[in-house]
């Protein structure tokens, strides 16, 4: 099993690489790529950790050597948010980065499962899909926008609010991966009831949690460590699915035939072909139905931005 991390010298990439080095199955290969010259050194640093995961780092303009034979590609390359920016401000820089990297993925490892972390995810996933369509290699079951950070934040904040063991909290988050498009389905959390006020405040906190971190870091970065953990959780789920493990379900932003938008985050069953099945997200409350319906114009606009960028 070979996993490639593109953008591996950045804050998310280094955290993700560290977690993968310690958690990938024995015998796996971990390939790190970044434009930054430090990247081979990051790999050397991580290679001193005593796990049976081979690691190699590549720097420079061309990610191809890192991508050869990759089963899973996780893309975190790009610029991070700073105070006052929202995820769409990142579009102007990150759109081109994702396009260029996906062109190389399409040419080098077209059947790999691709997980996109680079923001704005609502748009960068649409860019990736269009690039792969142009290259004639698009498989909607192999492309994912990683929204796991919204899920782990939801789990954490619910457990804190209700005094629960966080390991027992499971929550689906649907929609997209920015602002109002992030919709935690709090009405479905088992064994927990929320007041209307709690639902409103929790939903808003989850939607704005990225800004909470950006502001707390006072210009020194964005949510890199929690995103690294979220991306590792999702990446390991992709690997477990590829290895034939049953019942691996994660929420992800996918081209899943949603009635709501071309790309939509919802639970998916993972397997040897990536998405084995897009799962229904179930009954929602009136609050959630309203929030879902009112986000769709924003989400569709984000998607169109990506499609138009490639065309």
UniProtKB/Swiss-Prot annotation:
Residues annotated as the enzyme's active site: 177
MF GO annotations: L-malate dehydrogenase (NAD+) activity
Lineage top rank: taxon: Bacteria
Alphabetized UniProt keyword annotations: NAD, Oxidoreductase, Tricarboxylic acid cycle
Cross-referenced CDD domains: MDH_glyoxysomal_mitochondrial
Family per similarity comment: Belongs to the LDH/MDH superfamily. MDH type 1 family.
Self-association and partners: Homodimer.
Function per UniProt: Catalyzes the reversible oxidation of malate to oxaloacetate.
Protein name: Malate dehydrogenase
């Amino acid at each position: 099993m070979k996993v490639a991390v593109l953008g591996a010298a950045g804050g998310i990439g280094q955290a993700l690489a560290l977690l993968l080095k310690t958690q990938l199955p024995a015998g796996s290969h971990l390939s790190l790529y970044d434009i930054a010259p430090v990247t081979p050194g990051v790999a050397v640093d991580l290679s001193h950790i005593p796990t049976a995961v081979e690691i190699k780092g590549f720097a420079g303009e061309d990610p191809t050597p890192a991508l050869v034979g990759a089963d899973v590609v996780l893309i975190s390359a790009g610029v991070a948010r700073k105070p006052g920016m929202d995820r769409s401000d990142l579009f102007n820089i990150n759109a081109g980065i994702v396009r260029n990297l996906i062109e190389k993925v399409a040419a080098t490892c077209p059947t790999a499962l691709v997980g996109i972390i680079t923001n704005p995810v609502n748009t960068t996933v649409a860019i990736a899909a269009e690039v792969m369509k142009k290259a004639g290699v698009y498989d909607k079951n192999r492309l994912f926008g990683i929204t796991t950070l919204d899920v782990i934040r939801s789990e954490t904040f619910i457990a804190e609010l209700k005094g629960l063991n966080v390991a027992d909290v499971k929550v689906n988050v649907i929609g997209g991966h920015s602002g109002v498009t992030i919709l935690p389905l709090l009405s479905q959390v088992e064994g927990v009831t929320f007041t209307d006020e709690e639902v409103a405040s929790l939903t808003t906190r989850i939607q704005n949690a990225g800004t909470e971190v950006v502001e707390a870091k006072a210009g020194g970065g964005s949510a890199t460590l929690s995103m690294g953990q979220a991306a590792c959780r999702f990446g390991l789920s992709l690997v477990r699915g590829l290895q034939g493990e049953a019942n691996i379900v994660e929420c992800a932003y996918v081209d899943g035939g949603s009635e709501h938008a071309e790309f939509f985050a919802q639970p998916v069953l993972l397997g040897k072909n990536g998405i084995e099945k897009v799962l229904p997200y179930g009954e929602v409350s009136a609050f959630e139905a309203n929030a879902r319906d009112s986000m769709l114009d924003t989400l569709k606009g984000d998607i169109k931005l990506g499609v138009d960028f490639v065309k």
